[in-house]
Structures are given as structure tokens and as C-alpha cells.
UniProtKB/Swiss-Prot annotation:
GO molecular function: 3'-tRNA processing endoribonuclease activity; ribonuclease P activity; tRNA binding
Subunit structure: Consists of a catalytic RNA component (M1 or rnpB) and a protein subunit.
Entry GO CC: ribonuclease P complex
Gene that this polypeptide is encoded by: rnpA
Organism whose genome encodes this protein: Latilactobacillus sakei subsp. sakei (strain 23K)
Alphabetical list of InterPro entries matching this protein: Ribosomal_Su5_D2-typ_SF, Ribsml_uS5_D2-typ_fold_subgr, RNase_P, RNase_P_CS
Protein known as: Ribonuclease P protein component
Disulphide bond pairs: none
Class of enzymatic activity (EC top level): hydrolase
Entry keyword set: Endonuclease, Hydrolase, Nuclease, RNA-binding, tRNA processing
Reaction it catalyzes: Endonucleolytic cleavage of RNA, removing 5'-extranucleotides from tRNA precursor
Function in brief: RNaseP catalyzes the removal of the 5'-leader sequence from pre-tRNA to produce the mature 5'-terminus. It can also cleave other RNA substrates such as 4.5S RNA. The protein component plays an auxiliary but essential role in vivo by binding to the 5'-leader sequence and broadening the substrate specificity of the ribozyme.
Length: 120
């Protein structure tokens, strides 16, 4: 993902935390904030020390980034969202990570087909 697709600044993270609702499953928490004037989605990742050592945390972040890249055509565009990994996320394979993210994105209505069916 290019840098323009990332939420990096602490102030941006706080804005999303404060102004949005969270949705969670066993392994991930997602905060979503609609940004109508924005061209595309932006994502912020947070993987705390409870997930594991630095190698495990970086692996979880790589899996999340790869999953989001594969889901990019299906994601709603003018939105900022944060993905927070929970303790069990380091036990997941790449395929399991993607399935868990799809599940939590459906709950957060971040996927296009979910948003279309919710508006009908």
C-alpha cells in the first residue's frame, strides 16, 4: 500500500478513535470514520506488545496489509479505518487473517456489497 493509503499521525488516529464506533471479532477491532472529501480509503494498523515479540507483530502487520491490498477493490473509498490486532492474531495463517478481516469488515460495513445491501 502506498503511503497515501495510511493513517500515520497520532492526531488522525485520535480523530478516528473519538468520532467513530468500533466493531470487533475475536482477533481484530475495527474503528471506522467516513471522510466524504477524501479520494480513497486510509488504514491505520496497531499491533500491541501483547500480540508477541517484534517478529510476530511485524508478521501480523504484513498479513493485515496483504489482506487489505487483496480486498482493496471491494472496500469503500472515502473512509478512514483502524485495524487493531488482538492477542490471538499471531496464531493465524495468512488465509485465516484474511477471513477474519472480511468478517469484521462486513460487521463494520466497509465492504461495497455490504454497504449496498444495507442501504436497500
Amino acid at each position: 500500500m502506498r503511503k497515501s493509503y495510511r493513517v500515520k499521525k497520532e492526531q488522525d488516529f485520535q480523530t478516528v478513535f473519538d468520532a467513530s464506533q468500533s466493531v470487533a471479532n475475536r482477533n481484530f477491532v475495527v474503528y471506522r470514520l467516513d471522510k466524504p472529501g477524501q479520494k480513497h480509503f486510509r488504514v491505520g494498523l496497531s499491533v500491541g506488545k501483547k500480540v508477541g515479540n517484534a517478529v510476530m507483530r511485524n508478521q501480523v502487520k504484513r498479513y493485515i496489509r496483504q489482506s487489505i491490498t487483496e480486498l482493496k477493490p471491494d472496500l469503500l473509498q472515502p473512509v478512514d479505518f483502524l485495524v487493531i490486532a488482538r492477542r490471538g492474531a499471531n496464531q493465524l495463517t495468512m488465509a485465516e487473517t484474511k477471513q477474519n478481516l472480511i468478517h469484521v469488515f462486513k460487521l463494520a460495513k466497509l465492504l461495497k456489497e455490504e454497504a449496498d445491501s444495507a442501504s436497500e
